[in-house]
Amino acid sequence: RVLFRSYIELNKELIKNNINTVYNYINNKNASANELLKQKLKFEINTAHDIMASIYDKYKNQKTKEEIIEIMKTALENVRFNEGRGYFSIHTMEGVNVFHPIYKEFEGTLVLNRKDIYGDYPVRDAIAIAKAKTEGFFSWYYYKLKDKSKELKKLGIVKEFEPYNFIITTAEFEEDFENKVKNETIEYIKDIGDAEKDFIFIIDKDANFLLTRTKLVNVSDIEKENIFVKSYKELKNSNDKDKYFQYEHISKSEKISYLRKVE
């Protein structure tokens, strides 16, 4: 009996160590998500600037300013990144939109006074940053192209294009990038451990299964309150950070599970 208890304690420690490895990985990914997004946006804005600079250098002595701008707009028209969500826009330092591949109606109009639901003026902010330090990050709220029911936070970057006194901007909804990071994290965790012996499952704050070997979508889909549901609810509604529970597997063997919150 003592030997059995020692075996149980050893397995509890092994399970805890495995989950803590996953826990640390998730926390590190979450902590670095914003920095990764900034790096991505900086790379893309530099790419757009390089394209425009190359066109300018090639045609500055051959074509008019208006003709060169049209070539720049054509070059950037279909450039997309971040799974098709990312694009570029161009404004004058006075706040006139020069180029917008999605909202063509903005082109040629003064958008300096456009503000979000919190009263922030993104174009004004972008211009101020470009004037002060040529490039930098800023944020504001806007609605998605296919969902205008709510405005979500966007992280943007601006870079000055000095030859024409323009600014180039691009941005990403933070929620979309966080979801991308979340999906990458789940894919990584899928490959950890033995799927038959020590499967890892992930549940979000709304009790949805993000990773599971069953067809369950939500904890509420479990018809009767078994030991798992009971333990999950107890941990969720407590100030504890983790919890063990034991149960009898379908194979009639004793199983140990370990739950840990990710804040």
PLM features per residue range, with description:
Residues 1-66, 70, 74-86, 155, ...:
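Juxtamembrane extracytoplasmic/periplasmic/luminal helical "stalk" adjacent to the first N-terminal
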Residues 88, 96-98, 200, 207-213:
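Conserved hydrophobic beta-strand signature of PAS-family and PAS-like sensory domains
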Residues 31-32, 93, 216:
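Surface-exposed, polar/charged faces of alpha-helical domains
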Residues 62-75, 104-145, 182-187, 214-252:
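Extracytoplasmic/periplasmic sensor domains and loops in membrane signaling proteins
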Residues 87-90, 96-101, 106-107, 113:
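Mid-length scaffold segments of soluble, non-membrane domains
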Residues 86, 123, 148-159, 242-244, ...:
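A short beta-strand signature within small-molecule sensing/ligand-binding domains used
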Residues 93, 163, 205:
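Short, ordered coil/turn segments that flank beta-strands lining enzyme active or ligand-binding pockets
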Residues 152-184, 256-263:
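Conserved beta-strands of PAS-like sensory domains
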